[in-house]
Amino acid sequence: MADAAPQLGKRKRELDVEEAHAASTEEKEAGVGNGTCAPVRLPFSGFRLQKVLRESARDKIIFLHGKVNEASGDGDGEDAVVILEKTPFQVEQVAQLLTGSPELQLQFSNDIYSTYHLFPPRQLNDVKTTVVYPATEKHLQKYLRQDLRLIRETGDDYRNITLPHLESQSLSIQWVYNILDKKAEADRIVFENPDPSDGFVLIPDLKWNQQQLDDLYLIAICHRRGIRSLRDLTPEHLPLLRNILHQGQEAILQRYRMKGDHLRVYLHYLPSYYHLHVHFTALGFEAPGSGVERAHLLAEVIENLECDPRHYQQRTLTFALRADDPLLKLLQEAQQS
């Protein structure tokens, strides 16, 4: 779901509205699952579909733009984005789909092969629903399918073009500070090293429903403010980075029984928000943004800084941007001049 290019706007993380179901004994012992079945309502009334922004049959996901809170249906409502995603199978519950008398529709039968449409019971048929409301034009553009372009950014490009461009944007990260200050999501923190310089909090990413470990996804957010991205890192930050790598892996082992060699630990460049954070995902999970054009393994980042203190100030970095991103045009024009 993450885009190859960062969103420029307010909070970048998606807000989940989900109906979670009871976890198995093994999951509870591993700390998986913290949802509730209490009734909730969407934060708006009505939904008149305006456009399908994007869909993927492979990923079982669709992005919808709609008008909500309309008084008369004449377009005077507000914009909202709703993302519907089929949740992964939970192995311990799969057998329930085939026991008893499941509702079936035969689609095809030939010799030993047959295909059916199976209609699961309610408790096995949840759809993860992410709501962005009210949605701005930037949100609509973020979720709209667009062409991407690879661009190579030198150290000088970053200092002279990318950084001034970012500083000219309204990049609010107040939601990050709310987490660090325990004003929001405090109950979701899995681990914290409170050191103001070399500490961090570890929290489940909202793209992970915490119902299974196959798509485990956590984020480590550093306490120290002012570190925007990979480009800011120097040997001064090595204690922080080592803490995130080793303490983060240990916390995940203790909480979820997943060893470090089953984890992919990396930073994004460009990041989706400009406060240093590190991604922890299950190795077998093809997480959005884990491709070679965006993900930088934390262990290799540490080694690069140990070998060359100015590695990330000088190195040319490759990343993808949307074809209509103003930053892409600025970088292309500079490189053609």
From Swiss-Prot:
Its EC number is 3.6.1.59. Its main location: cytoplasm. One of its GO terms (cellular component) is mitochondrion. Changing H277N: Loss of decapping activity. Does not inhibit cap structure and capped RNA binding. Preferentially hydrolyzes cap structure (m7GpppG) at least 2500-fold more efficiently than capped RNA (m7Gppp-RNA). Changing E185A: Loss of decapping activity. Detected in liver, brain, kidney, testis and prostate. Induction: Up-regulated by menadione. Up-regulated by the transcription factor LTF isoform delta-lactoferrin (at protein level). Decapping scavenger enzyme that catalyzes the cleavage of a residual cap structure following the degradation of mRNAs by the 3'->5' exosome-mediated mRNA decay pathway. Hydrolyzes cap analog structures like 7-methylguanosine nucleoside triphosphate (m7GpppG) with up to 10 nucleotide substrates (small capped oligoribonucleotides) and specifically releases 5'-phosphorylated RNA fragments and 7-methylguanosine monophosphate (m7GMP). Cleaves cap analog structures like tri-methyl guanosine nucleoside triphosphate (m3(2,2,7)GpppG) with very poor efficiency. The modification N6-acetyllysine is found at K138, K142. The modification Phosphoserine is found at S24, S101. Changing F108A: Reduces decapping activity. It catalyses: a 5'-end (N(7)-methyl 5'-triphosphoguanosine)-ribonucleoside in mRNA + H2O = N(7)-methyl-GMP + a 5'-end diphospho-ribonucleoside in mRNA + 2 H(+). Residues 13-30 have a biased composition (Basic and acidic residues). Keywords: Acetylation, Cytoplasm, Disease variant, Hydrolase, Intellectual disability, mRNA processing, mRNA splicing, Nucleus, Phosphoprotein. It is found in: Cytoplasm; Nucleus. The modification N-acetylalanine is found at A2. This is m7GpppX diphosphatase. A motif (nuclear export sequence (NES)) lies at residues 142-154. Changing L150A: Inhibits nuclear export to the cytoplasm. Belongs to the HIT family. It is linked to Al-Raqad syndrome: A syndrome characterized by delayed psychomotor development, moderate to severe intellectual disability, poor or absent speech, microcephaly, congenital hypotonia, and severe growth delay. A motif (nuclear localization signal (NLS)) lies at residues 10-13. Residues 1-35 are annotated as: Disordered.
